[in-house]
Amino acid sequence: YKISAGPDDSMCKYLKSRCYAVQADTSLYVNCKRLRYKKFRFGGWYAPALRIGDHIYFSAIPLGSVAAGSDATMDVMLGGQFGDAIAASALISKRVYYEIDPETNKVGFVGKERMEELLGGHPDWKAAYLNENSESAKVTDKYLRLLKAEEK
């Protein structure tokens, strides 16, 4: 997402370069400009996020080893830049969840292992999550929202 402040250029620049997160009503957005997963950058945009406890979870495109292991990748037999572009385009519409550690500000992937930890106190939710057999943002989001609703 791109967030702007209308005609106020100085506020737009502030939102783009200095703001860590923006909350509008009940929606939270995290600025990905300075965030990295391992050595990969997310880009200069805002991602929709959820705050559960002290942790912030946001959805973004799969990066690095997450992209390589994602069910979003496809076997492309074309080589060179053209083949790379086709393979990368398959990931554009895919999303996975990442977690920002509040103590270190490090970004980690929210995969099956992490979701098993988070859902540990809810065996029925955990079993349902494992039956879905997907690390996509659509599936992960459903269970993170259940945890968020329980927190209230």
Whereabouts are the PLM-identified features?
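Aromatic-patch recognition
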Residues: 1-123
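C-terminal partner/receptor-binding element of secreted or periplasmic proteins
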Residues: 115-152
